[in-house]
Amino acid sequence: MQWFGGNVATAIQISRKNKALLIVYITTDSEDGQIFDGFWQHIDSSNLLCAVVGIKLKAGETSAQQFADIYPTPILPAAYLIDQNGKPLEVITPLVGKTYDQFRAKFDKATAQFVNGMPTAAANQLSTPSPSPAPVQVPASTDAPIPAPTPVTAPIQSSSTSQEMTRELAEKVARAKALLEQKKQKDAEKKREADKHVKEEMTKAREAKQERDAEALVKAAKQRKMEKLAAESDKKRILAQIKADREAAQKKFGKLVNTENASENTEKKQETTVGKAVPSDRCRLQVRLPDGSTFVEEFPSNDVLNSLVEIIRQKPSIAGTTFEIQQPYPRRIFTNDDYSKTFLENQLTPSTALVVIQKSSGSSSNYGSFSLSTQTVSFVTWVLYPLTAFWNIFCGMIGWNSTGKQQDSKSKKNDGPSTSGQSGSQPQRRGMPRSAEVRRRGNVAGLENPNEDDPEERASFNGNSTQFM
């Protein structure tokens, strides 16, 4: 393929002037660009159905960018086959022309479409090959004027030749259509096979997932069952270990008894049994007296309790009173019979705490002595009464008024506290005259002025300052 050396605008003008097919090829440095360059080298422009004007552009150049503004070129390399009206008849890219056969089929289809779209006379003229075609040479500089190409003259062929060419072109077109139809059918079949394969794969994947889920559920159920069995076995083992430890402990301390009998005995037994005394040589006692003081004494175990009683009687707070000795726990009150028993017999060994409690007989004896002293004083007063009478008569005869003095002193004593009490209990109120006297009867108070004898001044008022008769 021989390429035009000018720019795109000049190539368009020449193609329209010569009624030729315009080919714009945009190449790249990639592998696809090199393949397309090889395809164009196999095409002989002198052996085509119509005249062509081809221009080769480099991707990234200014001319290629200007052409891309009119005809977008998203995929490169690309070849645009454009008719006289500027309409692309075919766009050949690596997507549709990966092999030379595909590339040539697209190219032949575009040339045939270009020839069929032209008038018959022009088509016959263009379809007749020239004996010595000469490519149009244009200088590389775009500033120089481009001379018009020399028109190619071809001898007029016979009608049989034109019919053969038309028939050959129709056969090529039919063959190209058949190939395209076969290709479409093959592509559709491949697509159906691919869709079928995808559906089969999806079905297999779904079935495999369901199987995996079912296996996971079965495995989880088995795992839970095993865990449950393990937990039950551990529980039984722990209970058995606890039971064995309990039996061992009971055997060790001699307390292996029946559980049911022990519970029944525990419910029935409400009183605490008193343990037996521990035999010992000495008995240590802590005694608490009624005043709160305590003391500690130690006796031989074979000594009697009366020894402790004698020591308690010598205490100052107990001297001259009656008392009794009690044991707080277990609760016990010692009697006179217990005083003659030993500490061991009274179960007080080796040590015990005792409490001394005073009896109420001491208060009755004091009351009796108090009544006795009162009777004695009354008797003495009755005996001395005549002497007192004679003394008062003698003092009256002499002029000594002992009774009056006593009465005056008594009255002074009585007046003093009462006056002070009244003055203290009734302080003087602000705004009231000293001569005013208040008469109060319950919740009713009356004001009286001793200096004036006015009935209105003796008016009575209740607690709400309301006057009433």
Swiss-Prot record:
SMART domains of this UniProt entry?
UBX
Q: How does it sit in the membrane?
A: Peripheral membrane protein
Q: Oligomeric state and partners? A: Interacts with cdc-48.1 (via N-terminus) and cdc-48.2 (via N-terminus).
Q: Does the keyword Protein biosynthesis apply?
A: no
Biased segments, Low complexity type: 416-430
Q: What does the function comment of this entry state?
A: Probably acts as an adapter for ATPase cdc-48.1 and/or cdc-48.2, conferring substrate specificity. May play a role in the ER-associated protein degradation pathway (ERAD) possibly acting as a platform to recruit both ubql-1 and cdc-48.1 and/or cdc-48.2 to the ER during ERAD.
Show the CDD domains listed in the entry: UBX_UBXN4
Free-text tissue specificity from the UniProt record: Expressed in the germline.
Q: Which residues lie on this side of the membrane: Cytoplasmic?
A: 1-378, 400-469
Please give the residue ranges the record marks as intramembrane: 379-399
- Which residues fall in a coiled-coil region? 162-214
Q: Record the organism.
A: Caenorhabditis elegans
The record's Gene Ontology biological-process terms are: ERAD pathway; response to unfolded protein
Q: Spell out the InterPro entries in the cross-references.
A: Ubiquitin-like_domsf, UBX_dom
Question: Upon deletion of the gene, what happens?
Answer: RNAi-mediated knockdown causes a reduction in lifespan. Induces ER stress characterized by the expression of hsp-4, the accumulation of ubiquitinated proteins and an increase in ubql-1 expression.
Give the matching Gene3D superfamilies: Phosphatidylinositol 3-kinase Catalytic Subunit, Chain A, domain 1
Q: What induces it?
A: Induced upon ER stress. Down-regulated upon heat stress.
> Highest taxon of the source?
Eukaryota
Q: What does the UniProt entry say about where the protein is found?
A: Endoplasmic reticulum membrane
The reply to whether Coiled coil figures as a keyword in the UniProt entry is: yes
UniProt keywords (A-Z) are: Coiled coil, Endoplasmic reticulum, Membrane, Unfolded protein response
User: Cellular component terms, GO, for this chain's entry?
Assistant: endoplasmic reticulum; endoplasmic reticulum membrane
Protein name stated in the entry = UBX domain-containing protein 4
Per the record, what about its domains?
The intramembrane domain also contains the signal for ER targeting.
Q: Which residues form the UBX domain?
A: 278-356
Q: Which residues lie within the region annotated Disordered?
A: 181-212, 404-469
A matching Pfam family:
UBX
